[in-house]
């Protein structure tokens, strides 16, 4: 009886393995033929806005007297490029068969979409990218910049007269030598880096495990939250208030300042070197405290659980 029961099980297992092998071989053959093809789009109506949605391709903007879009693609990842209603639209589409998603040999080949256009000021820029990087040089400026990426990185040196809104999963966010009205940055495990950035209004940053690194940054107010990410400030000047809430991440500031500071962390340490004196209220359950006594300046409230607290004034 047991032998009779075992026979169908063996047959089913053989069929399952054989079927999987066939699908895997089909996907392998398909991947071997997945060559990269380059296409150019020159006959485009004038545009001042951008609506770009990509799957695996990197996106790069390049200064050029000639306006064109150069697309690298494979037979598995195709693109449509159009220009209508003053908007350049680039849409990537994954057309793999379902079994090719299961057996993924060499599918993520290096491909890129490059937008060539004259230097100058443009309207809104919207980008969605799954695994590709987004790179924007300083030759361009935009009225607004909105981007959502998964594993790709965002690297921009472009000024924005309006707001910058970036959402990333594991990708890194880097802005350097730019101005903007407001910044709202969210990342899961990716780091966030701002260098030589001047923001008229507020900067808001939120991550899970990613670190924040700000250098030579100015803004009206700053707010951030993180689980395990560290916060590092170097020459960061905030007109109004700095609000930081961390779980286990450290907070370190050098040559930085704000009218008021409110910092909370659990196991991370807090080490501040502020430009002007503050009235410091430091609270820690088991951590050590080394803070100066001052009766002038704005409030500086610091609360940790086990993290040490150190505060110094430059003046």
Where are these regions (language model features)?
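Eukaryotic tandem repeat interaction scaffolds
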Residues: 203-260, 268
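Acidic (Asp/Glu) and glycine-rich low-complexity loops/linkers
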Residues: 1-149, 153-168, 174-187, 193-206, ...
């Amino acid at each position: 009886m047991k032998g009779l029961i075992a026979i169908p099980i063996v047959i089913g297992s053989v069929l399952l393995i054989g079927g999987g092998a066939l699908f895997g071989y089909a996907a392998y053959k398909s991947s071997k033929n997945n060559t990269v093809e380059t296409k150019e789009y020159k006959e485009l109506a004038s545009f001042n806005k951008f609506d770009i949605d990509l799957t695996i391709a990197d996106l790069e903007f390049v200064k050029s007297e000639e306006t064109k879009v150069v697309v690298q693609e494979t037979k598995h990842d195709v693109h449509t490029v159009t220009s209508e209603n003053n908007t350049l639209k680039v849409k990537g589409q994954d057309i793999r068969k379902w079994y090719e998603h299961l057996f993924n040999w060499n599918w993520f080949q290096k491909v890129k979409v490059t937008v060539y256009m004259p230097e100058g000021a443009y309207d809104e820029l919207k980008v969605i990218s799954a695994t590709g990087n987004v790179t924007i040089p300083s030759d361009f400026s935009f009225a607004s910049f909105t981007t959502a990426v998964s594993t790709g990185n965002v690297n921009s040196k472009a000024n924005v007269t309006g707001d910058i809104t970036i959402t990333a999963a594991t990708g890194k966010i880097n802005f350097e030598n730019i101005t903007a009205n407001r910044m709202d940055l969210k990342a899961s495990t990716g780091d966030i880096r701002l260098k030589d950035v001047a923001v008229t209004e507020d900067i808001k940053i939120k991550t899970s495990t990613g670190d924040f690194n700000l250098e030579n940054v100015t803004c009206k107010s700053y707010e951030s939250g993180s689980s395990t990410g560290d916060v590092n400030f170097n020459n960061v000047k905030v007109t109004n208030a700095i609000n930081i809430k961390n779980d286990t991440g450290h907070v370190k500031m050098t040559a930085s300042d704000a009218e008021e500071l409110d910092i909370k962390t659990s196991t991370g340490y807090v080490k501040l070197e502020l430009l002007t004196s503050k009235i410091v209220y430091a609270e820690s359950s088991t951590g050590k405290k080394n803070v100066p006594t001052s009766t002038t300046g704005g409030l500086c409230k610091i609360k940790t659980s086990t993290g040490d607290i150190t505060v110094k004034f430059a003046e």
